Amino acid sequence: MLGAAGLGDIGQLFPDTGKEFHGADSLEMLRRVAKMVDDAGWTLANADCTVIIDQPQIAPVKDEMESNLSDAAGGTVTVCGKRTEGIGALGRGEGVVAIAVALLETK
């Protein structure tokens, strides 16, 4: 959402060097981003998020994730889980990849 609105990126707003962000509530961070986007004259039409991870599986919590994210973002957010079927570092549980695209509309 930040990038689509021309407001920089998440690392600028919430740097990983900022101790105040360690353990922060991610939904509250999303609400803050949504407010910035709104203040800049944009509204979220929709966002599509793909999470690549073998475990835990996304399916059992997909609806709850979508509801929580949509509420915090102020627009429709969909979540899709993808698995690597045990291939590579992700398959060994050494990481997770999240990719999202957001469509914004002018208010």
Model-derived features: positions:
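RNase III-family endoribonuclease catalytic core
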Residues: 1-72
